[in-house]
Amino acid sequence: MSWIERIFNKSTIIPTRKIDIPKGIWTKCDNCGQLLYKKELERNLEVCPKCDHHMRIAARVRLFSFLDKGSTSELGSEFEPKDVLKFRDSKRYKDRLISAQKITKEKDALIVMQGTLYGMKIVAASFEFAFIGGSMSSVVGARFVHAVNQALKIKCPLVCFTASGGARMQEALMSLMQMARTSAALANLHERCLPYISVLTNPTMGGVSASLAMLGDLNIAEPKALIGFAGPRIIEQTVREKLPLGFQRSEFLLEKGSIDLIIRRPDLRFKVAGLLAKLTQQPIPKVDYRHCVE
């Protein structure tokens, strides 16, 4: 037997057993493609430790990680969606709701909680993008107005994390009127001199960006978040021009003065607390203590 035959001789190859890795342990970054340990990613609030890409995070997880542990109580859960128009496109709206509720374990696209942030009383709301694209429905509008009313009642600031594709077309005018409804509610908050901070996350588009998302006393965005009314492809097709690089991203909007700050997700809790402390004339937090997600 020649040396080359000895190398490729099957009898010398040691068989190995394939190890089955349980699902849900590893995941890939949407941006850099790096393989990431899921537990580590969750600890980092779904921010890639390799490239700092901000992935989508569940609304409930976001609120639990933002508010003080053990201080949260949910508001507005009694509001539930109804298919009043019996709307149907390629699928019945009723079926879309059932499917979205099954996937997200939520009743609609906005979650509202009351709690404390470094000991300060606060009402916080967060959009669930996985629920029909975080679209604004009559229930979303009702819950947001309820959040504003609760902030007025206990005289505390309101913080809202937006992630939405816009108004929910399946509810037609009932969805569109939520733009005016939420804006009017925020006007009441402004009259009482209570701070409202809007945190725009990827993506914040359509009717949400044209109403409650841009009405904050401070408008903050996460890095590289897509923010606008119509999408960049639609704008390019309409104006028939090539848009600038990074158009509608948070960095572009900050440069043009449309937003006030860009803050990384892991830093939001501490920095928003500092801003609210200044706005409400309370002691500014000194140390950002870490706590586990509930």
Curated annotation (Swiss-Prot):
Positions bound to Zn(2+): C29, C32, C48, C51
The answer to whether UniProt assigns keyword Zinc to this entry is: yes
Q: Could you say which EC number(s) this protein's record lists?
A: 2.1.3.15
- The protein's predominant localisation is cytoplasm
Span of zinc fingers (C4-type): 29-51
Protein's recorded name: Acetyl-coenzyme A carboxylase carboxyl transferase subunit beta
Q: In which pathway does it act?
A: Lipid metabolism; malonyl-CoA biosynthesis; malonyl-CoA from acetyl-CoA: step 1/1
**Gene source species:** Blochmanniella pennsylvanica (strain BPEN)
**Which residues, if any, are the signal sequence?**
none
As its record notes, the protein acts as a catalyst of: N(6)-carboxybiotinyl-L-lysyl-[protein] + acetyl-CoA = N(6)-biotinyl-L-lysyl-[protein] + malonyl-CoA
Q: Which cofactor does it need?
A: Zn(2+)
Where in the cell is the protein located? Cytoplasm
What are the entry keywords? Answer: ATP-binding, Cytoplasm, Fatty acid biosynthesis, Fatty acid metabolism, Lipid biosynthesis, Lipid metabolism, Metal-binding, Nucleotide-binding, Transferase, Zinc, Zinc-finger
**What class does this enzyme belong to in the EC scheme?**
transferase
- Give GO cellular component annotations, separated by semicolons: acetate CoA-transferase complex
What InterPro entries does this protein's entry cite? AcCoA_carboxyl_beta, Acetyl_CoA_COase_Trfase_b_su, ClpP/crotonase-like_dom_sf, COA_CT_N, Znf-ACC
| Function, as annotated | Component of the acetyl coenzyme A carboxylase (ACC) complex. Biotin carboxylase (BC) catalyzes the carboxylation of biotin on its carrier protein (BCCP) and then the CO(2) group is transferred by the transcarboxylase to acetyl-CoA to form malonyl-CoA.
- Which processes are annotated in GO (biological process)? fatty acid biosynthetic process; malonyl-CoA biosynthetic process
Its domain of life? Bacteria
Which Gene Ontology terms cover its molecular function?
acetyl-CoA carboxylase activity; ATP binding; carboxyl- or carbamoyltransferase activity; zinc ion binding
Q: Which residues form the CoA carboxyltransferase N-terminal domain?
A: 25-294
Q: How does it assemble?
A: Acetyl-CoA carboxylase is a heterohexamer composed of biotin carboxyl carrier protein (AccB), biotin carboxylase (AccC) and two subunits each of ACCase subunit alpha (AccA) and ACCase subunit beta (AccD).
Looking at the keywords, is Zinc-finger present?
A: yes
Question: Which protein family is it in?
Answer: Belongs to the AccD/PCCB family.
Q: How is the cofactor bound?
A: Binds 1 zinc ion per subunit.
